[in-house]
Amino acid sequence: MDGSPPHPAAHRDPGPGPGRRDLLRLGTLLAAGGLAAAVPAALARADTATGGGGEVTTTYRGHSPYGFDQWASVGFDVPDGVRRISVAAAFDPADGVLDLGMFGPTGFRGWSGGARREFTLSGSDATPGYVPGPIGAGRWSVALGPIVNDPAGMPWQISVTLHHGPPLPEVPYDVLPGAVPGRGPGWYRGDLHLHTVHSDGGRTTDQLVAAARAAGMHFIATSDHNTSSTGLSWRGNVPADLLVLNAEEVTTRHGHWLAVGLPQGEWVDWHYGPADAGVFDRHVRQVRGLGGLAVAAHPMTPAPGSFWEFGLDRVDALEIWNGPWTLDDAANIAVWHGMLCLGQRIAGLGNSDAHGPADAVGEPHNVVHAAGLSRPEILDALRRGRSYAAENTGVTVDFTAAAHGATAGPGEELPLALFEAVDVTAEVSGAPDAVITLHTEWGVMAVARTGGDGRGRLHWRGWGRGSLFARAEVRRLKPASTTLDQLVAVTNPIWFHAAGLAPYDAGQRTLVAAVRAADGSWGRHTALPGVQGTPAVAGVGASVAGLPDGTVLTLGLGTDGGLWLTTRKPEGAPGPWRRLSGPHGRDGGAFLDAAIAGFPDGSGEIVAVAADGTLHHQRVTAAGTASGRFRPVPGDASAGGRAGGRRGAVRAAVAALPDGSAQVVAYGTDGALHHRIRRTDGTWTGWTRLTGRAGAPAFSGQALAIAGLLDGSAQVLAVGLDGTVHHRVRRPDGTWTGFRPLPGAAAPAVAAGSVGIAGLPDGSAQVAAVGRDGTARHCTRRPDGSWTAWARIPGPDGRGAFRAGRIAVAPLPDGTLHLAAVATG
């Protein structure tokens, strides 16, 4: 007898199946990376005791200093005849955590992190997380990852027991099938981030398979922390109806990432950080070379070691939704969206990160369109973004874009000509009482609601290359643990340009200003100077307001969602930009849309849609400083009100009236256009849903603007979901005209992606619009209600065309018209 703990497999005939001896030989190539960063631990002393049955125990006592990012090892020699190694650790949890692992002469032999304080391994069995196999003579090391929160450090003790005896038989493992037979092209559901007892999970592999079947998954990936042992544990229990992908969650001290689709037994090292030049990229190449996928896991989680520090553009995909929806996931999506706006094609994934039996597998999961239910086909589809993430298997999203007789879905290209229309549709089921939103790099373009039956449809028409991509989200307007809403589904984008053709540079989307003189002539465009000396400021939105003394307030919405304000006094240059605090006074708050209007008393009013979809407002002084902070605009049930009486919106505009009141129009989360008045005493009227064209109960659209005139009327411009521009007047007595389309230059209606309107002292309304060809045009509504013809706004050099993505205009008392726009080159 060798004194080893008994194991039921100790006397089994190994039978057919892959052995581990050849596999472990490969570890010599990996050991150099795994132990290179682990310095020998500072040992106080080592005591050895001999027990019965051929056991020899050596106890090593050491001390680790305060710190998080440190690795150490305890080395020991193993003579011939040892058949089992057992390790036990002791430390005070009040001092920190001691992660554990093992390396042998042939390389990696296991990792349990902080999930266990003891483990054992032999040729026939091993504690989950550790690789069974021959106990070869030579130098072995217990790998340590001390996380010490006590400034005085953490003392610890490692006991290594060597069990001598006759050789133990090796136990073979089963090879996971690479495909589920008989499954061709279609949509498949799968969860790529799952843990078992081989790391810190509470399920065995058999229990995980049962949970995946119960959740309706077609494929899963077992992704335990820093170990390859999960893939070597399949013995007679390989499922035939579920595709199991072998994976590892590579858990560094600088971010976690999923190596998905690894061959069984393959191990990826984790002992490195961003300062180790080229190491991370080498391991990503290793995974890709094996046909796998590198995914940044929960990258914006602010916990130590979880927050991503390696650069998000160096992986194949981002886990933008990890487990139950939280504020961390909202940050993931915001960062991912910013990358998409730069033309970076990186897939977004959703996984449950389920650990214990109480964690639901597949909530959320990925719905993937693949050529078949096989490892290479699923991974290829995921890499290309041919997927969307859903909170459960009851949710489906049919997201498509159609143009020139072709149709594309998530992850596909639909290259457009400059003047070409594109129709984007999202059909949703299984999501009762939710909101569907369509996003491009210009923000939320359209919104629709689902009914109590869970079904809903959104349609939007865009023009030409006005957008790089489109993607859809479905949200439930009910609070979660840390958010005011809950994500139900999110799609990867459909791209409107070919991968081999560079999209227009997002850095060229600069904020510019121009002036139209009272005689109708246009001055040259001026790029607004950037922040901290940069030559220009990049943005995705712009608004402008004129004050009675000739001051111009310009509002810019940055590519990061920041809201910036600058002031230009008469005959002066624009002043420095000031970033406005976010909702509730937080610094660095992000917004989706914003507009500003100027009042007769010299103040301005800003309305802004926060990142969580709530509408806020704030007063600013003529000097461009905030007179308070953003406060929620009250909501009500008829206008898609949010929890706590807040108003939900996706786009908003504001107009100042001569009596000092303000009128606000907004596309609500119900997909309809609403109107509200803030009285001069600061109180609000209720929201009114505006009827649509030709008696339709509502008007839905993608862009809007409002202007107040001296007679107390207000004029509204709204771009419908079909891309055409409509006009409506609210008379001084509060009654409305109906919506009418604006006539085009050579068509009964004009199409546009952005509009601005301003009322001049002579009673006219000046209109600017970005047409479907991406160029800006101008026309005038005369006081008698007739319209002038459209004319191009000249380009920056005073000639040619002015290309823009967003546009706004504001009047001054001298009859000039001031324009603010996001130029696209």
What do these predicted regions represent?
Residues 1-18, 31-33, 37, 43-45:
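N-terminal secretory signal peptides
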Residues 23-24, 169-254, 327, 356-358, ...:
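An N-terminally biased module of ancient metal coordination in phosphate/nucleic-acid-related enzymes
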Residues 52-53, 102-105, 133-189, 210-215:
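C-terminal edge strands of extracellular/lumenal beta-sandwich accessory domains
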Residues 98-154, 453-459, 594, 704, ...:
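Noncatalytic accessory or regulatory domains flanking protease catalytic cores in secreted, cell-surface
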Residues 170, 174-183, 253-267, 303-501:
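Charged catalytic cores and adjacent phosphate/nucleic-acid-binding surfaces used
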Residues 501-539, 562-592, 614-650, 672-702, ...:
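Trp- and S/T/G-rich repeat-edge/linker motifs of beta-rich repeat architectures
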